[in-house]
Amino acid sequence: MALRRVLVDRIVRSCAARAFASTSASYASARDALKEERPPTADELAAIPRERTRNFSIIAHVDHGKSTLADRLLELTGAIKRDGSNKQVLDTLPVERRRGITVKAQAVSILHREPSDGQAYLLNLIDTPGHADFSFEVSRSLSACDGAVMLVDATQGVEAQTIATFYLALDRNLAIVPAANKVDMTSADVERVAKQMERAFGVEREDVLEVSGKTGHNAEKVLSAVVKHVPHPSGDPNGPLRVLLLDCHYDDYRGAVNIVQVADGVIRKGDKVSSCASGQHFEVLELGMMTPERTKTDAMYAGQVGYMITNVRDVRSSKVGDTLHMKNEPVEPLAGIRPAKPMVFQGLYPVNSDDFEKLKAAVSKLTLNDASVTAQTENSTALGAGFRCGFLGLLHADVFHQRLQEEFGAEIIATAPTVPYRIKHANDEAYIDCTSPLAIPSGGFPSKGTEIEEPLVEATIICQPHVVGKVVELCMDRRGEQLEQNFLDDSRVILRYRLPLGEVAADFADELKSRSSGYATFDYDDAGMAKSDIVRMDVLVNGSVVDALATLVHRSKAQRHGRDLVARLKEALPRQLYEVALQAALGSKVIARETISAMRKNVTAKCYGGDISRKKKLLEKQKEGKRRMRRIGNVDIPNETFAGILSNKRN
């Protein structure tokens, strides 16, 4: 029987391989029929009317194949040559290619000739990130779209971030084109995934496209579905000019390069435009579309997405979500984009304090390129001058650190992540925001009458039924409150929990992956604030408070966290000539302690026999000297040691 199953499996695999070899051939024939072997010219782009323009995005969970499918669509329409080296063409950052994830949303304009009517259509494709930390990029991209291709991995099924991005699209009334990707994989189960999509999103089975981003199978059907189901832009081509600023990045040669969508009217090279937000005036020096390289055009019309370069080089003059209009012709601003809300804060300091100006320049340029990052200067007694930066999540922070190192050569120390708390002291009437432990006085915080609120999130977790118990145990340990538990199908369970953001921001994702053997996924959304018993925990080295190691923790977790922190500190600090006490304290109450024993010099080595009192005298003298050193000595903590101590996990 076992041999029979092996033979049947080989036959199935062989048939599948032949089937997809034929689909690759059909993809090649479709490519030859639908495209020319070159990107579109400026004249061809400008000739497409608004009625034959489609703005759409590809949305999905991370690693479900968005960028790979985008590569096939670009090849199919001739935007790029068909080449085996085409991988993540729209992922231009080094960190994106190294990690295999999309961090920055990218736009590209392609021409597609629809077989059903023979007409050429201008399709503006926006490739979006899939990770929860980059939801701001997704939200910003969808604001320029009229529809979205919702991609689901046929080998994995609907995931937590699939649901999150679906509701983002639904909130904007976008037309949805459902598609199951990776159908060429032998482990793909299209019918099961289609049923999940029916249950989770209310789509019809016959509307679910079966595609392969790897082979290009049915890629032409994706384009046809976009033309058929996604409406054209609704702007007024004859109305007053209104341009939505979607993104901005800095070019070393051209200065600020703005990614824009023309909502109404026409914008031409040489026009004078003004900002609704600041009132500042600009002159349009260059505009065009991305094909995916910049293609200059003389004008951009209502509904089109492209780039614009003005006479202002400073990126800070460009505010994402701003509305631009003709100078001296004021208009009603567009709805714009909801500002990003930082969820995690970290202190960033240079390893060498002399490199602060270099770090300042690097942070300034990166924050201008990433509107979701906030940065304010901050000073630490231990680490010197640095920045308190706000991020959308830990992956977002990690990518920012990596870009600082790769693009600017900045070596940094990142403090432990904190979340934004709100504090109201006894005599105050309103709450104040607190994003850093350094903003709170040490010694007995909170004082009597002080109220503290911590941020909450509603987490959506999708896992297999046999690990539900472990996931529930993890959520309860993180002070979670269960809101809902449903079966997506017989192999998927959806859990919804209300959790403190501080518990999620630390290592929740890693613990979830560990307890579910890597199969559980989760996404979260803001759920407001709630009162909580938060305390400031200080770390003392030889009796002196080290401000860089201060943290805000829940009282119930303080002792566990304190023990772990002083244990890591003991491992990292070099031994001294005297005994060093490491303590974690809540005000004056010590909750954890470790001791680094002194290095012992053998002062009796020169004594060769004789009276024992001579040895005792030397030992007493050594002991007194160490007591004096312990009273007046300062332990110097190297910056490299801080980097190891402040990591989330213990080695």
Curated annotation (Swiss-Prot):
It comes from the Eukaryota. Keywords: GTP-binding, Hydrolase, Membrane, Mitochondrion, Mitochondrion inner membrane, Nucleotide-binding, Protein biosynthesis. It is an enzyme of class 3 (hydrolase). It catalyses: GTP + H2O = GDP + phosphate + H(+). It is a peripheral membrane protein. SUPFAM superfamilies: EF-G C-terminal domain-like, P-loop containing nucleoside triphosphate hydrolases, Translation proteins. This protein may be expected to contain an N-terminal transit peptide but none has been predicted. GO terms for molecular function: GTP binding; GTPase activity; mitochondrial ribosome binding. It is found in: Mitochondrion inner membrane. GTP binds at residues 60-67, 127-131, 181-184. CDD domains: EF4_II, EF4_III, LepA, lepA_C. Promotes mitochondrial protein synthesis. May act as a fidelity factor of the translation reaction, by catalyzing a one-codon backward translocation of tRNAs on improperly translocated ribosomes. Binds to mitochondrial ribosomes in a GTP-dependent manner. Belongs to the TRAFAC class translation factor GTPase superfamily. Classic translation factor GTPase family. LepA subfamily. One of its GO terms (cellular component) is mitochondrial matrix. Its EC number is 3.6.5.-. This is Translation factor GUF1 homolog, mitochondrial. One of its GO terms (biological process) is translation. Pfam families: EFG_C, GTP_EFTU, LepA_C. HAMAP family: LepA. Residues 51-234 form the tr-type G domain. Its main location: mitochondrion.
